[in-house]
Amino acid sequence: MKVMIDTNVIISALLSPHGQAAKAFYKALQPPFEPLVCSYIIDEVQRKFAEKLAAHASKLCRFEDILPLFRLVPMPAETVEGEMFIRDIKDMPILRSALAAGSDYLLTGDKDFLEADIKKPQIVSVAQFLAI
């Protein structure tokens, strides 16, 4: 089962390694799951650490160390079905990548995703993913 892990879950997992987001993050790295990431998410994680979390740079290094465990998926430029349900246009590249990769789940804490009427991939919160 393919899981696209959103930026907010990655950052929460890195900052609180014993928290619920970290548990979901590490669960997604284990079979039967296949963790997915796109260049947009990688760039966003790096940018947020540079802009707001510079004091935690060592935690960013941890992410970069485990990045080879993820499958890097393409980020299509074309509009995809379901985009009209996303309020924040900055989230569209993530949805496009998840759809192009055939992701089963999008693991996120982003309310714009969680409240959107998107059927595929299944949008799940940390708590929902931990219950799978």
Where are these regions (language model features)?
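Metal-dependent nucleic-acid phosphoesterase active-site entry motif
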Residues: 1-18
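Acidic, PIN/NYN-like endoribonuclease modules and their adjacent C-terminal/linker elements
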Residues: 104-107, 111-132
